[in-house]
Amino acid sequence: MPLSGMKRKRSDETGRRKRSSGVKQGRTSAARAGSAVRRTRPSLQIQTLQAAGTSMIEVPSGGVCDLLGSFSRGSDEGNRHTNETVIYKVALDYHFIATAAACKYSSIGTGVVWLVYDAQPSGNPPTVKDIFPHPDTLTAFPYTWKVGREVCHRFVVKRRWTFTMEVNGRIGSDIPPSTSCWPPCRKNIYFHKFVTGLGVKTEWKNTTGGEVGDIKKGALYIVIAPGNGLDFTVHGNARLYFKSVGNQ
């Protein structure tokens, strides 16, 4: 019994010495030497495509198809610095205005805007019917269009939106009689979309241009079509957030 009591005393004294020293067993300075260093990601590049004045986009019945991401080779922020680019985000801020010819009638139409990926560009910009083949009898109803079965391996719809425009038979220069007023209609509309998570990769040829003919693989188009034949013009900005990747 006395021996066992002495053993407990020694173990208690050892524990007190360990606690008073403040050193944790099994920990070394090497554990802290490999602490992670936070790295900041480089900012995305930005290209702004403006439609205003003489560069406004005219959208006739049947629609239009334009290239997004026309990155020419260069050193500016809006240029591609390598032969590969990746579009991550797109911000659309457009104002649609019905033409005077369309305003002469009283009508309502549902138009459509698409973002379309082209996996295998042919060197020439595609037409709307190349992507969405349809009979002429469905030209006024773009919400019924589908990607052609023969080209579904090439064209992929990334985003699709609809919008409504109205005209009431009056143009902007008309003046109502003093005894009446004309109710407003949606012949001028604001179209805003912010798209994330696109990840559209484009491989460019060994050229300096930024057109469809300079693309080897992967292109992004915007397709706009009016509903019920209500032609309009597009004013505003498309902003693309992208990166130049790969080798110089």
Swiss-Prot record:
GO BP terms in the entry: symbiont entry into host cell; viral penetration into host nucleus
Region (Disordered), start-end ranges: 1-42
Subcellular location: Virion; Host nucleus
Classification via InterPro entries: Gemcoat_MSV (IPR000143), GV_A/BR1_coat (IPR000263), Viral_coat (IPR029053)
Disulfide bonds: none
Motif Bipartite nuclear localization signal boundaries: 1-28
One CC-aspect GO term: T=1 icosahedral viral capsid
DNA-binding among keywords: yes
Main location: virion
GO molecular function: DNA binding; structural molecule activity
Described purpose of this protein according to its UniProt entry: Encapsidates the viral genome into characteristic twinned ('geminate') particles. Binds the genomic viral ssDNA and shuttles it into and out of the cell nucleus. Plays a role in protection of the genome from degradation, virus acquisition and transmission by insect vectors, infectivity, and systemic movement. The CP of monopartite geminiviruses is absolutely essential for virus movement.
Protein family: Belongs to the geminiviridae capsid protein family.
Name of protein: Capsid protein
Biological source species: Sugarcane streak virus (isolate South Africa)
